[in-house]
């Protein structure tokens, strides 16, 4: 029994494709030719030193221009921001410099950004990368990468109004294209899409609209399993010694910020914690994520960011009720923690269902009832109570003018598109999971047992 439980936890913690004979079935990774594959037969920004077909591994070296300090000066007196791996300073006109405290973090982000640059060069006619950040240069000696400069991100941009809805509709379609480009043409899984990692460019003038949203920060991006070559290292061309292995350890707990974790990842985390007993499930990690799973998680996380931003638009100024609920939940060591994160997301989706007179099926409803299977009774009651409490607070701060605008269908298509990926099951939405509940089913917030199968 103990062996079976450990096998279950290990399988639940892994995001890689299952073995052909395994029980964890899901759609196979789609064949494509990504930038990782193309690097094996050409020389570009990063030069290929050695190809190990059996190990599915590439050895590369950095180009000469990254090894010399021929770049704009960094204004160390003008700090723009800071993060886990370094700080961002002003540099030349219109650019900024990200100075890393860790050589490993610098190498990783440099390689990921150069792969994106390579993909762009190989796909000149593909404009899906317009909303994906590009880098200007990098210096190994200074452990610094130069980027175009933006004044704010979705995390710091708080002055949303109903007039921004059309901008959000347009730009999140562009961000969705960027995720597809990253997945299909770059062979990468972002894994950390959040408001802080989406930059904002506004039109000039007070109360101006959003000109563009840009997906950035590949500091924890990973090479997904859809590539022919699934790992990569930076080697010294003189003696072939390994300088850095571009490898990220993945688990459902490490993927995405908790407050924007999609439903499929919340489900995995919940099950891992629920069945853990004395096993440290956070130590169960893997180094490969399947291509389809990578796309599902990134698109589903993008949906959660959109819902969070939409909640800012819907709420009275300075309320941030939706965001506060998600950020202030305590005791992340329990399985119930992941159900409490689920509550506000379900309530907001229910609001949209009612506005558009459509019954979304996301695998669970605000009554704590699953489309397939069931939660333990105490957890059903907990999720139901969480949804009720949040709805009471949220309804009190929602602006009527926004509901009217949303009722006209703004954001409807992009939310439908992103909902195609997420579902409260470990592999996300699959072909048998319809986007909408059956026409005769009860509303998502009604008192009903199983609104999808009853």
Curated annotation (Swiss-Prot):
Which residues participate in ATP binding?
80-88, 98
Q: Which UniProt keywords apply?
A: ATP-binding, Kinase, Nucleotide-binding, Transferase, Tyrosine-protein kinase
EC number(s) reported in the record: 2.7.10.2
Reaction(s) catalysed by this chain, per the record, are: L-tyrosyl-[protein] + ATP = O-phospho-L-tyrosyl-[protein] + ADP + H(+)
Q: Which GO terms describe its molecular function?
A: ATP binding; non-membrane spanning protein tyrosine kinase activity
- Identify the catalytic residues: 192 (proton acceptor)
Q: Which family does it belong to?
A: Belongs to the protein kinase superfamily. Tyr protein kinase family.
This chain belongs to the protein called Putative tyrosine kinase 36
């Amino acid at each position: 029994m103990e062996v079976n439980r450990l096998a279950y936890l290990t399988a639940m913690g892994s995001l890689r494709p299952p073995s052909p004979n395994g029980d964890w079935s899901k759609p196979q990774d789609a064949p494509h030719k990504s930038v990782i594959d193309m690097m094996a037969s050409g020389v570009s920004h990063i030069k290929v030193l050695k190809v190990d077909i059996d190990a599915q591994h590439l050895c590369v070296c950095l180009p000469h221009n990254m090894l010399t300090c021929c770049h704009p000066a960094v204004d160390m007196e003008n700090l723009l921001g800071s993060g886990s791996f370094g700080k961002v300073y002003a540099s030349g006109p219109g650019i900024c410099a990200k100075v890393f405290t860790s050589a490993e973090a610098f190498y990783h982000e440099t390689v990921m950004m150069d792969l994106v640059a390579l993909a762009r060069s190989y796909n000149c006619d593909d404009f899906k990368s317009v909303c994906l950040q590009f880098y200007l240069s990098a210096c190994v000696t200074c452990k610094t990468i130069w980027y175009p400069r933006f004044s704010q991100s979705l995390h710091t941009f708080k002055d949303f109004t109903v007039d921004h809805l059309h901008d959000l509709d347009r730009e999140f379609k562009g961000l969705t294209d960027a995720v597809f480009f990253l997945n299909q043409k770059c062979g990468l899984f972002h894994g950390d899409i959040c408001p802080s990692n989406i930059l904002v460019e506004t039109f000039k003038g007070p109360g101006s609209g959003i000109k563009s949203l840009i997906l950035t920060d590949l500091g924890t991006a990973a090479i997904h399993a859809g590539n022919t070559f699934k790992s990569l290292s930076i080697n010294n061309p003189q003696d072939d010694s390994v300088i850095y292995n571009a490898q990220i350890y993945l688990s459902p707990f490490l993927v995405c910020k908790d407050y924007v974790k999609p439903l499929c990842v919340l489900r995995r985390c919940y099950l891992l914690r629920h069945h853990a007993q004395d096993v440290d499930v956070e130590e169960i990690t893997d180094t490969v994520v399947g291509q389809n799973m990578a796309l599902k998680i990134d698109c589903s996380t993008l949906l959660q960011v959109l819902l969070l931003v939409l909640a800012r638009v819907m709420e009275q100024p300075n309320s941030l009720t939706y965001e506060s609920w998600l950020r202030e939940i305590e005791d992340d060591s329990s399985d119930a923690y992941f159900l409490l994160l689920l509550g506000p997301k379900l309530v907001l989706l229910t609001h949209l269902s009612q506005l558009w007179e459509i019954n979304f099926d996301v695998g669970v409803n605000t009554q704590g009832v699953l489309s397939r299977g069931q939660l333990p009774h105490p957890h059903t009651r907990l999720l139901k109570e969480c949804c009720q409490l949040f709805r009471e607070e949220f309804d009190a701060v929602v602006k009527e003018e926004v509901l009217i605008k949303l009722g006209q269908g703004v954001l409807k298509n992009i939310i439908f598109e992103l909902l195609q990926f997420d579902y409260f099951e470990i592999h996300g939405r699959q072909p048998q999971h319809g986007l909408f509940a059956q026409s005769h089913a009860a509303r998502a917030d009604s008192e009903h047992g199983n609104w999808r199968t009853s």
